């Protein structure tokens, strides 16, 4: 059966689309014009598409497309808000892969990155995310 995208809001509004096959997620070549029109019409940040995959130390494959006016990034290599939302939804449905509320998402390989997002959903249902970062700017803001 076909999967259905659902619109969720965790601050940013994300369309989430689960697929059964990680290879299908990795092989996506979406029409960015159509995605831009859809996300603009629904005032969404973007579309996050994911599937389980237990390989190379991760449990999920995630891709996030944000070509609309809200972000204007065709594909985000690592997306904290989308990953946190996916983890929350999967935990609510008792479908979070991994163990004891923990899992690791792979994102960004298709755009030349190999991001790993560590996801944890605690007993209260709060999603926590973490991982390694590559700082691109450092400083202090005074106000």
Which sequence ranges carry the predicted segments?
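Active-site proximal loop and beta-alpha junction motif in alpha/beta enzyme cores
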Residues: 1-143
